[in-house]
Swiss-Prot record:
It catalyses: ATP + H2O + cellular proteinSide 1 = ADP + phosphate + cellular proteinSide 2. It is found in: Cell inner membrane; Cytoplasm. This is Protein translocase subunit SecA. It comes from Caulobacter sp. (strain K31). Its main location: membrane.
Amino acid sequence: MLGFAKKFFGSSNERKVKAMSARVAQINALEPEYAALSDEALKAKTEEFKARLAKGEPLDSLLVEAFAVVREAGKRVLGMRHFDVQMVGGMVLHGGGISEMRTGEGKTLVATLPTYLNALEGKGVHVITVNDYLAKRDAEWMGQIHNFLGLSYGVIVNGLSQGERQRAYRSDITYGTNNEFGFDYLRDNLVYSVEEMVQRGHHYVIVDEVDSILIDEARTPLIISGPTEDRSEFYKTIDVLVKDLIKDKTNFDHDEKQKQVILTEEGQERIEEILMAGGHLAEDTAGLYDAANISIVHHVNQALRANVLYTFDKDYIVKDDEVILIDEFTGRMMTGRRLSEGLHQAIEAKEGVSVQPENQTLASVTIQNYFRLYKKLAGMTGTAATEAQEFDDIYKMGVSEIPTNRPVLRIDDDDEVYRTEREKNDSILKQITDCHARGQPILVGTVSIEKSEELSRLLATYAWEWEGKKHTGIPHQVLNARFHEQEAGIVADAGVPGAVTIATNMAGRGTDIQLGGNMDMRLANWRQQQKGLGITPTHEDELAQRAELEIEIGAAKARALAAGGLFVLGTERHESRRIDNQLRGRTGRQGDPGRSKFFLSCEDDLLRIFAGERLDAIMRTFGVQEGEAITHKWLNNAIATAQKRVEQRNYEIRKNLLKYDDVVNDQRKAVFEQRQEFMEATDLSDIITEMRHDVIDDFIARYMPPKAYAEQWDIEGLDERVQAILGLTLPLKEWAAEEGFGDEEMRERLNKAADEYAAQREAIITPEQMRSVEKNFLLQMIDLQWREHLMHLDHLRNVIGLRGYGQRDPLNEYKTEAFSLFEKLLGDLRTNTTRWLMTVEIAYAEPEPLHTPEGLVEVHLDPLSGENVATAGALPEGLSPQQREALPVSVLPEGWEYTARNGACPCGSGKKFKHCHGALV
């Protein structure tokens, strides 16, 4: 019935696209008129549109004219005309949806339409790409259109100064990566003055490769952290013990499907014996699982995970004495990202490299919650349909499949499945040889660096024969995390006849594989060669070189087309169908022919874990011989079903994690907004007074509860708190003994006495100086309390799952306890602020401006772990005289400032100085 209805009425996607065709016709109708305009008249349209917006005209009413202006500018500046289907893609983006456009259909050019239209409002438009190279390329390329039309553009890449970032964000359109935008948001909430902030709000954003960023990285929080104490030697000790333990596989259980590993009962007993014999357990404890040894249990578990779950050259590589994570989805190195909870340190100990200190979180946000800050969110990709439900559920974004400008001529062959890895590799080598010899370019996709380099070794020594001639080795290029610097160049040449390119998953995404070669990259290489020879090419030289290259590339393209176009060969199926579709989508661009095929074996991870035994039994039943493959539609369907199950499981994990992070996100927004108000204010005295009165209200509620009799009051306890927090010695007992005296009278007298004392303290210095003291102190205090709160939430999140064993919903438990912790944060902020401002000795010296702490670590965690990181900034060993003089108030008793940061705090709290009073300075 559904198919019958679709036949007559079309799919919902077709109806959406058709509905936009009327506006496309209107845009086309304006083309002759705008083509006749001079450059100045066309540029003047921008100011005309802004003036109409200022008069109250809605933005949507400008869409037809604005899109027509951008199309004309594209023709004049870049020699590129937006196709009708690109106009449809631009409308979807303007509406806050996702445009699914196939590779080669010009997503980068499409983005110029909605960016121009939305930038007219003057609130800033952000365009997100997956790496710095693409951000710079797109900004310099498409920025020419925006500049021509009178709009400014900027680009945010790693290594920019604060001033450069501010200028880029103040541009009409800003390009950059999701990491850079996210970290700038977090840094803006660590600074101490509005002038230091770089971003100016979150108005409209377009995310390129939206599936990669909003789905694949959805479990990867952006974290700014600082180092804690050094436990590197202990990590090494535990690693040695665990390496010995796992030699006997009865000591642990490894669940590959869930990616988990735990000690068996035998393993627990064995490691306990070893630790006890080595004197590693706390004294006078019953065993490993005694509360005093819980941190040791944590170290053992992380060492176990590092040695069993994480594989060298697949999950990470070692480079320059560092463990660098590998992105499972792209195969790229994730430089700067570190796994949390000591797991990264455990891997460092495993590999024998320097063990870096653990980190404590100063600020964090998930990719999901960062992008949900924007009033309007849009995205582009070649593969989003398989995740349409998730985009709708989490981001409220619809996916629209945009028709191709030309028909797709790609042929997708059925998978070939072999019994063993060796048989599969033999067939892959034969297929590569055939393509190379016939002049057909081939892109080979692998799932890991290890697999790409193994295949490279096989190709280097492969003996083959073609037309009676014998050869050894096949020339090829390898594109993985080790060679990411050459990424764009390798991908650009992947379409020349006979080229063999091995790439991990979707490395090189964002750069088209053009049959015959990439003109822009060839020209860039030529310019570089000329520069090396000391020659500065003239415009005429460039035109002549371009003409020469057009002939050369045209001839090469004809040979590649005659051989069948680009052949895409997948060496394994990914857990996600979308990643497989991304690989397939590299061929068949702009109506070119192409072919794709996956070569699989029963030993591949996906098939082995989810369908290995059944598949092997079927192959035996059918009598499949050595080197033979089975190819059938039902087999493709069975693999797709296994992938759907894994996708659904991963989606549930992401959705569940988001529910937990939403709890933190609400609190984060509240704290960041409050902090922003503090920073922008010039006078916080009313807030300080309100805090003081709230503290007194808390005292009254605790020590003189409502409806309690006078003999039930705890006046002694109240007196202690008043002296400790307010610095006041008052005759509370005499007051309480007065006839008719109650809680309201106590509140009034305490408020009056505290206000008078605060006024006396303020008289020691000028009102302006006091406002400066209050503001600087309050900002530092809110940061300190928020950091401690994040640490408590981390600990809560790590143990809350155990509540499920007690038949209680862990999420509801987490919400309840997180709210209680947040209330405690607010209470502590009021109390600590009041105590310090009422009790410290005021000795004012003109303070240096407060700046964001230096030496912070920016971390974006591995998508597979989805774990949180622990956090905090390092303080120096005591404070220098200059630092002491710069303190707005003497917040420490005399001599305490010389305490070593890792030493015990002199206050007797039992905490380290850096985690107690030292954190205040």
